[in-house]
């Protein structure tokens, strides 16, 4: 069964190339053919941004599950198996159900032009509409305004995580254009929660949404981390201070991601839900999220796995290892639409050297030779390898 699924997913990637003009029309036409499942979903929390989307989603999901809610979630990309992307009522979709519904939607689409992300999003919405849940948490794949997840008509809460330069070929060449695309998820009458941003981004967002009647919560104004220690952080939400367990996920940026999730939960309380401080703390404590400064060991040597791939992500890695007073060898691969040289410049102070690899199964990955060439420009030692 897993081999059948992998084969079908590969067919969808081949038949429907990733690089295609951004539009919602193709997906809307397909959804209409399957009775518009995107209009039959539980209350939606929709998350856009550049960094921290997946972690914020995971904190929210674990807090909600701790409160005995059934939660659907849509996540991208996946780390190990495609099933990770679709959470049905607190559980990963089983392979047999995923395969059956992929085959069905593929047949309905009848090889009409559509991207891999669009057709798999159609499958996710179809599955979500067939099973009861209390909430659906959606993570955008790319941008917001024209992201496939943005076919939904209403959302209870819109969350904007930290925004950085990324996907410029689709979203625009500067941070303001990128921010504008991310804000495209904001729906009429939804509650807007804005995470910690660069000053220029916060100013732009305030101006952009000031005429909207939505409830708006900005990091630094309506909620803010007041202090942290080794076990807890204090979050001010409006005029009340909350003592929250530190996440088990490493890095100070994870405290910021957790604070964004807690702000969303506290807003839900204002809307009539009931999440106690104990539930919030237990949910934060139990949250796990692979590939985010995930610590392991190899022959008694500490190994960290992290998916940071843009300047802000690199800065968080830099801060973490500087705080540890450690330098590390970097086993490193990156897609060729990322700013490789800027990334390497940021992490150079904590880097003993780079082992350059090509990302397995990714045609659009930098080659080890290209990574090595950029390392040479910065006098970073680099060794080229075929794989990990």
Where is each model-derived feature located?
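Hydrophobic anchor at the beta1->P-loop junction of P-loop NTPases
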Residues: 45-47
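Nucleotide phosphate-binding/pyrophosphate-handling subdomain across enzymes
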Residues: 41-43, 130, 135-140, 146-159, ...
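Charged, amphipathic alpha-helical linker segments immediately N-terminal to NTP-binding catalytic cores
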Residues: 1-20
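ATP-dependent carboxylate-amine ligase catalytic core
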Residues: 18, 24, 28-32, 37-42, ...
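Conserved catalytic-core segment of NTP-binding enzymes
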Residues: 145-146, 152-212, 340-342
């Amino acid at each position: 069964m897993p081999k059948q699924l992998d084969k079908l997913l590969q067919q969808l990637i081949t038949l429907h190339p990733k690089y295609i003009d951004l539009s919602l029309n193709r997906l809307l036409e397909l959804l209409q053919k399957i009775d518009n499942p995107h209009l039959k979903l539980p209350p939606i929390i929709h998350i856009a941004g550049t960094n921290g989307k997946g972690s914020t989603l995971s904190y929210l999901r674990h807090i909600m599950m701790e409160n005995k809610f059934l939660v659907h979630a849509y996540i991208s990309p996946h780390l190990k198996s495609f099933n990770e992307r679709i959470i049905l009522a607190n559980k990963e979709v089983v392979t047999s159900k995923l395969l059956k519904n992929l085959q069905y939607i593929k047949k309905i689409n009848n090889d009409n032009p559509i991207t891999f992300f669009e057709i798999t999003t159609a499958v996710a919405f179809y599955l979500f509409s067939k099973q009861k849940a209390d909430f659906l948490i959606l993570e955008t794949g790319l941008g917001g305004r024209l992201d496939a997840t943005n076919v939904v008509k209403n959302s209870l809460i819109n969350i904007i995580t930290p925004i950085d330069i990324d996907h410029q070929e689709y979203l625009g060449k500067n941070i303001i254009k990128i921010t504008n695309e991310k804000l495209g998820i904001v729906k009429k009458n939804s509650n807007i929660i804005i995470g910690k941003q660069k000053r220029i981004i916060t100013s732009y967002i305030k101006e952009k949404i000031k005429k909207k009647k939505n409830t708006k919560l900005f990091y630094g104004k309506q909620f803010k981390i007041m202090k942290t220690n080794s076990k807890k952080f204090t979050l001010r939400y409006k005029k009340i201070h909350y003592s929250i367990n530190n996440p088990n996920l490493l890095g100070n940026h994870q405290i910021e991601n957790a604070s964004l999730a807690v702000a969303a939960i506290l807003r839900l309380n204002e809307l009539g839900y009931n999440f106690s401080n104990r539930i919030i703390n237990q949910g934060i404590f139990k949250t796990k999220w692979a590939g985010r400064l995930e610590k392991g060991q190899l022959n008694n040597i500490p190994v960290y796995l992290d998916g940071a791939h843009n300047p802000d992500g690199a800065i968080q890695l830099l801060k973490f290892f500087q705080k540890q007073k450690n330098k590390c060898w970097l086993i490193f691969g990156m897609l060729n639409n990322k700013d490789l040289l800027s990334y390497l410049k940021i992490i150079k102070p904590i880097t003993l050297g780079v082992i350059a690899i090509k990302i397995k199964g990714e045609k659009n990955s930098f080659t080890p030779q290209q990574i090595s060439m950029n390392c040479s420009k910065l006098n970073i030692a680099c060794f080229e390898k075929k794989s990990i």
